[in-house]
């Protein structure tokens, strides 16, 4: 309610041109819808409900990018393709048979994605969906991410006859937003990256071995999408004597610059 298809057409069509591609039409249409979300920017025609129209438009574009069509293929085909591409762990095909994946496929409700706001779809794309970070290509859609995460969590559940029930319950709760998962968990489950800590606290002592070891650990954890907390309270201030005054401490600033460089060198955002 409170949205108008004709208003979207009126807003987007002036930007169309001869020879325009369908991708460009999608992008211009999305931009027009997003502009209508802001009631201050469009006081007479805008409404916050356009955020859900924009979500549907962005989802349509995502599915075309990932699957080449709006309707997703079978879950087994998606998993098999992404395992072959090295984006999913090969263990997924060891833990579960094709029949198991087909059973999970029946549990998925892809229509849930159509109820998401534009901001929610963009957040899933930007933070959680498996992608090639060099090319930007995305390889799954939100409901697939939730199901692969559920399958990974319960792959060792005993008895095996109960696994599918647990997977279904977990998937339904996660996809309905009844609980949230930390970014490295939701983004990493089912992938070759086995690091699920959102925040890692690293403590540095006031000696070179510890200072340089802290920098190494920061870089390694950052490369696996972990957030970093650094405790530096043990470092002495500038000018403090070292080895009885043979040399003096250079203070925190040089080491803070070093640690910042270590972090930025491998940060994945």
Predicted region positions:
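Extended catalytic cores of very large enzyme megasubunits
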Residues: 1-269
